[in-house]
Amino acid sequence: MKVHMKSLNYLLVFVFALLLSTAAFSVDKGYVGEEGTEIEVIRVSAPPPEYPRRAVRLGVEGTVRLEFDVDTDGSVLDPYVVESNPQGVFDRAAIKAVRKFLYEPPTYNGTSVKVNNVQIDLTFKLT
């Protein structure tokens, strides 16, 4: 019974943390063309990342900076971690979440374009 209650307590803490966790996002900008013109990309869908269970259990918070491209259809291409703090704790959850992001199909001078080197910060915070 004691082991069952301990498991239940962990589950309740995890669920509570998921409900109260927030993911803060930075302004999304990237570059187009050979001249590297900076443009903004508009995010229309951004499901929140899953808070890793171990981080919830240990009460860990952190930030992950990701970089990726936005394709002409608004989908995210090739996301990778630029830096994270604490290192490695939230990387997998951040990449998994950003792969589900959707942007308005980007245009530049009336033409559909792929936007390169978009960087965002995902902040994992227990509240």
Predicted features along the sequence, with ranges:
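Charge-biased low-complexity segments
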Residues: 2, 6-10, 22-127
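Hydrophobic core
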Residues: 14-20
